[in-house]
From Swiss-Prot:
InterPro entries: YaaA. It comes from the Bacteria. It comes from Pectobacterium carotovorum subsp. carotovorum (strain PC1). GO terms for biological process: response to hydroperoxide. This is UPF0246 protein PC1_3665.
């Protein structure tokens, strides 16, 4: 099984590393093309394009200008350990064993506006460029046009290398929109996480994001290989709800905390 997740806006480049091993991102030629576009933007244009504060715009203008594709452990960090949003709180890769990292490297992929597809141990320089950003480029008006079929082709390669045709989509809609399902050589499975509030079950964004990370952790640490095994997911009080599920959409619920 191959797992896809979204990146995070919050980054951590200071806490101790759980592993010293690293790999290089495979789509850096594409990243360099995007950086060339971003380097031409003023901080004011970045603030407007990304709907961020002037302070954040200045930070990211600096990141764009300093970016170069020569990644080392001194100027970059493994992607799985650099991202720090809700998904990554659930994943908690900071306590992974080397065997966990091995399994994750084969079976987990992070989708990225700048890097396209990242493996867990791929080094990454800090950036902010969300997939939904309407950044005009030579291929079109946004990043979806820029990436085209490239992300899908990279996922197909990863599917072949890890040995089956099942993709568990734990990424957000914004990011998975960069994937072309009809060109993906895989059966797509989408877990959905519902939390109870006032007696009704619904998707609550903060909890759902963390649950996507928890599910990723569950697959990695239990070395799951079959879709049927996903139904055993029970971290943090979630349980599988067969009545609301279909073959390719697995619904998990959790009672009010």
């Amino acid at each position: 099984m191959l797992i896809t997740i979204s990146p995070a806006k919050t980054l951590d480049y200071t806490s101790p590393l759980a592993t010293t091993r690293y790999t290089q991102p495979e789509l850096l030629d594409y990243s360099s093309q995007l950086i060339d576009v971003c380097k031409k933007l003023t901080p004011a244009q970045i603030a407007s394009l990304m709907s961020i504060s002037d302070k954040l715009a200045d930070l990211n203008a600096g990141r764009f200008s300093e970016w170069h594709p020569d990644f080392t452990p001194e100027n970059a960090r493994q992607a799985l350990l650099a991202f720090k949003g809700d998904v990554y709180t659930g994943l908690a890769a900071e306590d992974f064993s080397e065997d966990d990292f091995d399994f994750a490297q084969q079976h987990l992929r992070m989708l990225s506006g700048l890097y396209g597809v990242l493996r867990p141990l791929d080094l990454m320089r800090p950036y902010r460029l969300e997939m939904g950003t309407k950044l005009e480029n030579k291929a079109g008006k946004d990043l979806y046009s820029f990436w085209g079929d490239t992300i899908t082709e990279k996922l197909n390669q990863a599917l072949r290398e890890q040995g089956d045709d099942v993709l568990v989509n734990l990424a957000s809609d914004e990011y998975f929109k960069a994937v072309k399902p009809k060109k993906l050589n895989a059966r797509l499975i989408k877990p959905v996480f519902l939390d109870e509030k006032n007696g009704k079950f619904k998707v609550i964004s903060f909890y759902a994001k963390k649950a996507r990370g928890l599910m990723s952790r569950f697959i990695i640490q239990n070395r799951l290989t079959q879709p049927e095994q996903l139904k055993a997911f029970n971290l943090d009080g979630y349980f599988f709800e067969a009545a609301d599920s279909s073959a390719d959409e697995l619904v998990f619920k959790r009672h009010e905390q």
